[in-house]
Amino acid sequence: MFKGSIVALVTPFRDGAVDEETLRRMVDYQIENGTDGISPCGTTGEASTLDYDEHMRVIEIVIQQVNGRVPVIAGTGSNSTTEAIELSRKAKKLGADGVLLVSPYYNKPSQEGLYRHFRAIADAVDIPQVLYNVPGRTGVNMLPQTVARLAEHDSIVAIKEATGSLQQASELMEMCGDKIDVISGDDFITFPMMACGATGVISVVANIMPREVARLVDAFYEGDMDEARRLHLSLLNISNAMFIETNPVPVKTAAALMGLCAEELRLPLAPLGDASRATLCAVMKSYGLI
Protein backbone atom coordinates (compact mmCIF):
# COMPACT_ATOMS: atom_id res chain seq x y z
CA MET A 1 0.00 0.00 0.00
CA PHE A 2 2.79 2.45 0.89
CA LYS A 3 5.87 2.43 -1.31
CA GLY A 4 8.62 4.62 -2.65
CA SER A 5 10.49 7.45 -0.94
CA ILE A 6 8.52 8.63 2.08
CA VAL A 7 10.07 11.50 4.02
CA ALA A 8 10.20 11.41 7.81
CA LEU A 9 9.50 15.12 7.95
CA VAL A 10 11.20 17.43 10.43
CA THR A 11 8.96 19.79 12.41
CA PRO A 12 10.09 23.41 12.01
CA PHE A 13 9.96 25.64 15.08
CA ARG A 14 10.34 29.38 15.48
CA ASP A 15 10.36 31.22 18.81
CA GLY A 16 9.19 28.11 20.62
CA ALA A 17 6.17 27.40 18.42
CA VAL A 18 5.52 25.27 15.35
CA ASP A 19 6.40 27.35 12.28
CA GLU A 20 3.28 26.66 10.23
CA GLU A 21 4.26 28.70 7.18
CA THR A 22 7.62 26.97 6.88
CA LEU A 23 5.98 23.58 7.40
CA ARG A 24 3.72 24.21 4.42
CA ARG A 25 6.72 25.23 2.29
CA MET A 26 8.59 22.10 3.30
CA VAL A 27 5.67 19.91 2.24
CA ASP A 28 5.61 21.55 -1.19
CA TYR A 29 9.40 21.24 -1.49
CA GLN A 30 9.15 17.51 -0.90
CA ILE A 31 6.39 16.88 -3.41
CA GLU A 32 8.00 19.10 -6.05
CA ASN A 33 11.17 17.02 -5.72
CA GLY A 34 9.61 13.61 -6.21
CA THR A 35 8.84 12.40 -2.69
CA ASP A 36 6.17 9.68 -2.76
CA GLY A 37 4.75 10.17 0.73
CA ILE A 38 5.07 12.29 3.85
CA SER A 39 5.25 11.07 7.44
CA PRO A 40 4.95 13.88 10.01
CA CYS A 41 5.27 13.55 13.77
CA GLY A 42 7.72 10.68 13.92
CA THR A 43 11.15 10.50 15.52
CA THR A 44 12.55 12.99 13.02
CA GLY A 45 9.58 15.28 13.64
CA GLU A 46 10.35 15.55 17.38
CA ALA A 47 6.90 14.17 18.14
CA SER A 48 7.80 13.40 21.74
CA THR A 49 8.26 17.14 22.39
CA LEU A 50 4.89 18.16 20.92
CA ASP A 51 1.84 18.56 23.10
CA TYR A 52 -1.45 17.06 21.91
CA ASP A 53 -2.72 20.20 20.18
CA GLU A 54 0.60 20.80 18.42
CA HIS A 55 0.79 17.18 17.35
CA MET A 56 -2.64 17.29 15.77
CA ARG A 57 -2.01 20.70 14.22
CA VAL A 58 1.15 19.50 12.48
CA ILE A 59 -0.73 16.51 11.06
CA GLU A 60 -3.61 18.75 10.00
CA ILE A 61 -1.33 21.24 8.21
CA VAL A 62 0.52 18.50 6.37
CA ILE A 63 -2.73 16.89 5.22
CA GLN A 64 -4.10 20.27 4.10
CA GLN A 65 -0.95 21.21 2.22
CA VAL A 66 -0.51 17.81 0.58
CA ASN A 67 -4.12 18.06 -0.61
CA GLY A 68 -4.22 14.48 -1.85
CA ARG A 69 -1.06 14.67 -3.94
CA VAL A 70 0.78 11.94 -2.01
CA PRO A 71 -0.13 9.72 0.96
CA VAL A 72 0.27 11.11 4.48
CA ILE A 73 1.29 8.60 7.15
CA ALA A 74 0.84 10.39 10.46
CA GLY A 75 2.89 9.45 13.49
CA THR A 76 0.45 8.51 16.25
CA GLY A 77 2.44 6.06 18.34
CA SER A 78 2.74 6.26 22.11
CA ASN A 79 3.87 4.21 25.07
CA SER A 80 0.25 4.50 26.23
CA THR A 81 -2.09 2.27 24.23
CA THR A 82 -5.06 4.48 25.06
CA GLU A 83 -3.24 7.59 23.85
CA ALA A 84 -2.14 5.87 20.63
CA ILE A 85 -5.75 4.95 19.93
CA GLU A 86 -6.89 8.53 20.57
CA LEU A 87 -4.18 10.02 18.35
CA SER A 88 -4.93 7.52 15.58
CA ARG A 89 -8.65 8.24 15.68
CA LYS A 90 -7.97 11.96 15.42
CA ALA A 91 -5.52 11.48 12.53
CA LYS A 92 -8.13 9.43 10.69
CA LYS A 93 -10.71 12.17 11.24
CA LEU A 94 -8.26 14.74 9.86
CA GLY A 95 -7.86 12.68 6.70
CA ALA A 96 -4.56 10.83 7.12
CA ASP A 97 -4.01 7.97 4.68
CA GLY A 98 -2.37 5.87 7.37
CA VAL A 99 -0.71 6.04 10.77
CA LEU A 100 2.82 5.20 11.90
CA LEU A 101 2.89 3.46 15.27
CA VAL A 102 6.20 3.29 17.10
CA SER A 103 6.72 0.47 19.56
CA PRO A 104 6.00 1.58 23.13
CA TYR A 105 9.14 3.13 24.57
CA TYR A 106 10.50 3.23 28.12
CA ASN A 107 8.08 0.65 29.56
CA LYS A 108 9.80 -2.19 27.60
CA PRO A 109 6.86 -4.56 27.07
CA SER A 110 7.28 -8.24 26.34
CA GLN A 111 6.57 -9.61 22.87
CA GLU A 112 3.08 -10.50 24.08
CA GLY A 113 2.67 -6.95 25.37
CA LEU A 114 3.72 -5.56 21.99
CA TYR A 115 1.25 -7.84 20.25
CA ARG A 116 -1.63 -6.83 22.50
CA HIS A 117 -0.75 -3.11 22.22
CA PHE A 118 -0.78 -3.06 18.43
CA ARG A 119 -3.73 -5.43 18.21
CA ALA A 120 -5.77 -3.14 20.47
CA ILE A 121 -5.05 -0.14 18.23
CA ALA A 122 -5.88 -2.10 15.08
CA ASP A 123 -9.15 -3.31 16.60
CA ALA A 124 -10.11 0.20 17.72
CA VAL A 125 -9.25 2.29 14.64
CA ASP A 126 -10.04 1.32 11.06
CA ILE A 127 -7.14 2.98 9.24
CA PRO A 128 -4.06 1.51 7.50
CA GLN A 129 -1.41 1.08 10.16
CA VAL A 130 2.39 0.95 9.79
CA LEU A 131 4.24 -0.61 12.70
CA TYR A 132 7.54 1.06 13.57
CA ASN A 133 10.32 -1.05 15.04
CA VAL A 134 13.27 1.06 16.21
CA PRO A 135 14.80 -0.69 19.23
CA GLY A 136 17.67 1.79 19.45
CA ARG A 137 15.11 4.42 20.48
CA THR A 138 12.49 2.32 22.27
CA GLY A 139 14.56 -0.21 24.21
CA VAL A 140 12.72 -3.24 22.85
CA ASN A 141 13.03 -5.14 19.57
CA MET A 142 9.78 -6.39 18.04
CA LEU A 143 10.69 -9.82 16.72
CA PRO A 144 9.61 -11.09 13.29
CA GLN A 145 7.43 -13.73 14.95
CA THR A 146 5.43 -11.00 16.68
CA VAL A 147 5.09 -9.02 13.46
CA ALA A 148 3.87 -12.17 11.69
CA ARG A 149 1.08 -12.51 14.24
CA LEU A 150 0.09 -8.87 13.79
CA ALA A 151 0.22 -9.16 10.00
CA GLU A 152 -2.93 -11.26 10.15
CA HIS A 153 -4.93 -8.12 11.05
CA ASP A 154 -6.41 -6.36 8.02
CA SER A 155 -5.61 -2.87 9.35
CA ILE A 156 -1.89 -3.61 9.80
CA VAL A 157 -0.45 -3.10 6.33
CA ALA A 158 3.28 -2.46 6.78
CA ILE A 159 6.22 -2.18 9.12
CA LYS A 160 8.97 0.42 9.18
CA GLU A 161 11.93 -1.76 10.09
CA ALA A 162 14.72 0.29 11.64
CA THR A 163 16.92 -2.24 13.40
CA GLY A 164 19.65 -1.79 10.81
CA SER A 165 19.75 -5.58 10.53
CA LEU A 166 19.43 -7.11 7.08
CA GLN A 167 19.07 -10.50 8.75
CA GLN A 168 16.00 -9.39 10.70
CA ALA A 169 14.57 -7.59 7.68
CA SER A 170 15.03 -10.74 5.60
CA GLU A 171 13.34 -12.86 8.26
CA LEU A 172 10.44 -10.41 8.31
CA MET A 173 9.98 -10.63 4.56
CA GLU A 174 10.26 -14.42 4.61
CA MET A 175 7.69 -14.76 7.40
CA CYS A 176 5.10 -12.17 6.42
CA GLY A 177 6.21 -10.26 3.31
CA ASP A 178 3.22 -11.71 1.48
CA LYS A 179 0.85 -10.11 4.01
CA ILE A 180 2.39 -6.72 4.83
CA ASP A 181 4.89 -4.35 3.25
CA VAL A 182 8.32 -4.01 4.82
CA ILE A 183 9.71 -0.47 4.57
CA SER A 184 13.30 0.47 5.32
CA GLY A 185 13.69 2.74 8.32
CA ASP A 186 17.42 3.23 7.71
CA ASP A 187 18.65 5.30 4.77
CA PHE A 188 21.98 3.52 4.60
CA ILE A 189 20.42 0.12 3.80
CA THR A 190 17.48 1.13 1.62
CA PHE A 191 18.90 -0.50 -1.51
CA PRO A 192 19.90 -3.78 0.17
CA MET A 193 16.51 -4.00 1.87
CA MET A 194 14.69 -3.38 -1.40
CA ALA A 195 16.79 -6.13 -2.96
CA CYS A 196 15.32 -8.40 -0.26
CA GLY A 197 11.77 -7.22 -0.96
CA ALA A 198 11.23 -3.94 0.89
CA THR A 199 8.85 -1.52 -0.83
CA GLY A 200 10.76 1.69 -0.12
CA VAL A 201 12.07 3.84 2.70
CA ILE A 202 10.81 6.25 5.32
CA SER A 203 13.78 8.54 4.97
CA VAL A 204 15.63 11.10 7.06
CA VAL A 205 17.98 12.06 4.21
CA ALA A 206 15.01 12.95 1.99
CA ASN A 207 14.50 16.07 4.10
CA ILE A 208 17.55 17.58 2.41
CA MET A 209 18.02 15.39 -0.71
CA PRO A 210 14.49 14.37 -1.71
CA ARG A 211 15.18 14.08 -5.42
CA GLU A 212 18.14 11.76 -4.96
CA VAL A 213 16.38 9.43 -2.51
CA ALA A 214 13.33 9.28 -4.76
CA ARG A 215 15.53 8.56 -7.76
CA LEU A 216 17.21 5.65 -5.97
CA VAL A 217 13.86 4.02 -5.26
CA ASP A 218 12.55 4.78 -8.75
CA ALA A 219 15.65 3.28 -10.36
CA PHE A 220 15.12 0.10 -8.40
CA TYR A 221 11.50 -0.17 -9.50
CA GLU A 222 12.52 0.53 -13.09
CA GLY A 223 14.93 -2.39 -12.94
CA ASP A 224 18.01 -0.18 -13.31
CA MET A 225 20.07 -1.90 -10.64
CA ASP A 226 23.31 -0.25 -11.68
CA GLU A 227 21.81 3.22 -11.18
CA ALA A 228 20.15 2.22 -7.90
CA ARG A 229 23.44 0.79 -6.64
CA ARG A 230 25.33 3.90 -7.73
CA LEU A 231 22.90 6.16 -5.89
CA HIS A 232 22.99 3.93 -2.82
CA LEU A 233 26.75 4.19 -2.61
CA SER A 234 26.77 7.90 -3.42
CA LEU A 235 24.40 8.63 -0.53
CA LEU A 236 26.30 6.69 2.13
CA ASN A 237 28.33 9.65 3.41
CA ILE A 238 25.33 11.94 3.81
CA SER A 239 23.31 9.10 5.35
CA ASN A 240 26.01 8.54 7.94
CA ALA A 241 26.27 12.29 8.58
CA MET A 242 22.60 12.40 9.52
CA PHE A 243 23.41 10.25 12.54
CA ILE A 244 26.67 11.73 13.82
CA GLU A 245 24.54 12.85 16.76
CA THR A 246 21.01 11.99 17.81
CA ASN A 247 18.42 12.25 15.03
CA PRO A 248 16.97 14.78 14.18
CA VAL A 249 19.70 17.16 15.37
CA PRO A 250 21.98 16.71 12.31
CA VAL A 251 19.20 16.73 9.71
CA LYS A 252 17.52 19.81 11.15
CA THR A 253 20.90 21.54 11.27
CA ALA A 254 21.47 20.57 7.64
CA ALA A 255 18.02 21.80 6.63
CA ALA A 256 18.73 25.11 8.36
CA LEU A 257 22.06 25.48 6.57
CA MET A 258 20.14 25.03 3.31
CA GLY A 259 17.58 27.68 4.31
CA LEU A 260 14.71 25.20 4.54
CA CYS A 261 13.84 25.95 8.17
CA ALA A 262 15.24 27.41 11.36
CA GLU A 263 17.72 25.34 13.34
CA GLU A 264 15.56 25.53 16.46
CA LEU A 265 15.20 22.30 18.43
CA ARG A 266 13.26 21.52 21.57
CA LEU A 267 14.84 20.37 24.78
CA PRO A 268 16.07 17.89 25.74
CA LEU A 269 17.64 17.97 22.26
CA ALA A 270 20.60 20.34 22.14
CA PRO A 271 22.31 22.05 19.19
CA LEU A 272 24.87 20.08 17.21
CA GLY A 273 28.32 20.09 18.79
CA ASP A 274 31.11 22.07 17.15
CA ALA A 275 33.08 19.05 15.94
CA SER A 276 29.97 17.39 14.54
CA ARG A 277 28.93 20.65 12.86
CA ALA A 278 32.30 20.88 11.13
CA THR A 279 31.96 17.29 9.92
CA LEU A 280 28.40 17.87 8.73
CA CYS A 281 29.35 21.04 6.84
CA ALA A 282 32.25 19.28 5.13
CA VAL A 283 30.00 16.44 4.00
CA MET A 284 27.29 18.82 2.80
CA LYS A 285 29.85 20.83 0.83
CA SER A 286 31.03 17.63 -0.86
CA TYR A 287 27.46 17.14 -2.13
CA GLY A 288 27.07 20.78 -3.17
CA LEU A 289 24.29 21.32 -0.65
CA ILE A 290 25.93 24.42 0.83
Swiss-Prot record:
Annotated protein name in UniProt: 4-hydroxy-tetrahydrodipicolinate synthase
Enzyme Commission number: 4.3.3.7
Annotated function: Catalyzes the condensation of (S)-aspartate-beta-semialdehyde [(S)-ASA] and pyruvate to 4-hydroxy-tetrahydrodipicolinate (HTPA).
Stretches that traverse the bilayer: none
Gene3D superfamilies referenced in this protein's UniProt entry, alphabetically: Aldolase class I (3.20.20.70)
Compartments in which it is found: Cytoplasm
Record's keyword terms, sorted: Amino-acid biosynthesis, Cytoplasm, Diaminopimelate biosynthesis, Lyase, Lysine biosynthesis, Schiff base
Positions bound to pyruvate: T44, I202
Residue positions of the active site: Y132, K160
GO BP terms: diaminopimelate biosynthetic process; lysine biosynthetic process via diaminopimelate
This protein's record includes keyword Membrane: no
Pfam families, per the entry: DHDPS (PF00701)
Self-association and partners: Homotetramer; dimer of dimers.
GO molecular function: 4-hydroxy-tetrahydrodipicolinate synthase activity
Assigned GO CC terms: cytosol
Pathway: Amino-acid biosynthesis; L-lysine biosynthesis via DAP pathway; (S)-tetrahydrodipicolinate from L-aspartate: step 3/4
Site (Part of a proton relay during catalysis): residue numbering on this chain: T43, Y106
The keyword Amino-acid biosynthesis belongs to this UniProt entry's keyword annotation: yes
Sequence similarity: Belongs to the DapA family.
Main location: cytoplasm
